[in-house]
Amino acid sequence: MKELELINIIKEQTQSGYIGDDCAFLKDLNIVVTQDNFIEDVHFKREWATPYQIGYKAATVNISDVLASGAKPAYLTVGLSAPNDIDNDFIKELYRGISDGAYGAKIIGGDITGGNKLFISITAIGTTKDRKISSRSHAKPGYVVITHGKYGESAKGLEELKQGLRKSDSIRAHLEPKLEPEFSEAISCNIREDYAMMDTSDGLADALYKIAEASNVTIKAKNIEGIFGFEDYHLVAAVPDSFLNKIKFNYYVIGEVKEFDCSYLNINNIKYYDY
């Protein structure tokens, strides 16, 4: 079953109006909330990463969603299930990584239990005061699509790990992704119009497709290097063209939003009807 199908079943059963974006926006409380699991042999292998790197990435996958919403990272709770071979030094380094990967957010609690595999479940809270919060359903015809950073390094790093390599710039990009709080702040603190923003944890092309589908538009994009990669954790946003001169941060334009035309995503005139 695809992730979207599963999400739709959960939405139907819970009748929740908060499910759909990577963060739930609780407007009356001025916060966003998100949660991600980080599971050994699913999302990482202990032989490929240091305890610090495991903790760092476990935090950044959550903080990235907070930044994609436009909010400011504020708090984390950490649920940890650890096997018996995890020692005190491992835990110290793991939590040092979580703290560094929190980008200023404070760890305020959590839960600890035993288990057969290392399992980290983090809930992140961001504050929304003086910020305009994004939604993937807010891309509109006439908007331009912007992003920042180089794509494809994380996917390259994973392949190198599979080949037995342990150190390279690409491997570090995969294990210790650098987030973009400045990009998020440059948009959310200055924009007044609705806009759509996501991180590219599942790939740039995937994020573009999800924004277009949620907004019922077509995004026409350039086929830049790494567009079909994954886990780069850059941000991509669809914003009004008139807003570009207000952004005091490096970015580049990769596409434009059009009225829906048969497919949600068009990359160099190749239409993608599903992704």
Where are these regions (language model features)?
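Short hydrophobic/aromatic beta-strand micro-patches
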Residues: 125-127, 236-240
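Glycine-rich anion-binding loops of enzyme active sites
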Residues: 38, 72-159, 256
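Short, compositionally biased
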Residues: 156-173
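Active-site-proximal betaalpha loop/short-helix elements
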Residues: 83-85, 173-232, 274
